Amino acid sequence: MKLHELKAAEGSRKVRNRVGRGTSSGNGKTSGRGQKGQKSRSGGGVRLGFEGGQTPLFRRMPKRGFSNINTKEYALVNLDQLNVFEDGTEVTPVVLKEAGIVRAEKSGVKILGNGELTKKLTVKAAKFSKSAEAAITAKGGSIEVI
């Protein structure tokens, strides 16, 4: 037996079903689309949420709430993420972005108190949670609101 004589095992390679190739193929004429109607046509079909002309559920439900255009969205950083820095480092939003901890600054950076801080750092951010503030100062570090 040579390399060019190798064949796939019987039944291991299934032949793709080609529709619309004659009635004797089993999938000719209507190509598995049933009889006439919107769904049988080329490009036919109904949009997402369409209920046959009946007022759809999303329009029957009342509107609720609103989006406040003045909402400030902060980039959130937890304490355990700050352990990548050396002792005595001044951590600013720019430094956090360079380190890959923060992608976009948004309305500024907020430091949260999840995890444990093991380094003494000077942290500058727009906001601090009370637990984060306490943890940073407990390690001998300092905080500055910018």
Swiss-Prot record:
Region ranges (Disordered): 1-61
InterPro entries recorded: Ribosomal_uL15, Ribosomal_uL15/eL18, Ribosomal_uL15/eL18_sf, Ribosomal_uL15_bac-type, Ribosomal_uL15_CS
Comp. bias regions, Basic and acidic residues: 1-13
Keywords of this entry: Ribonucleoprotein, Ribosomal protein, RNA-binding, rRNA-binding
Keyword DNA-binding applies: no
One annotated GO biological process: translation
Compositional bias segments (type: Gly residues): 23-35, 42-52
Record's function text: Binds to the 23S rRNA.
Family to which this protein belongs: Belongs to the universal ribosomal protein uL15 family.
Protein's UniProt name: Large ribosomal subunit protein uL15
Lineage: Bacteria, Bacillati, Bacillota, Bacilli, Lactobacillales
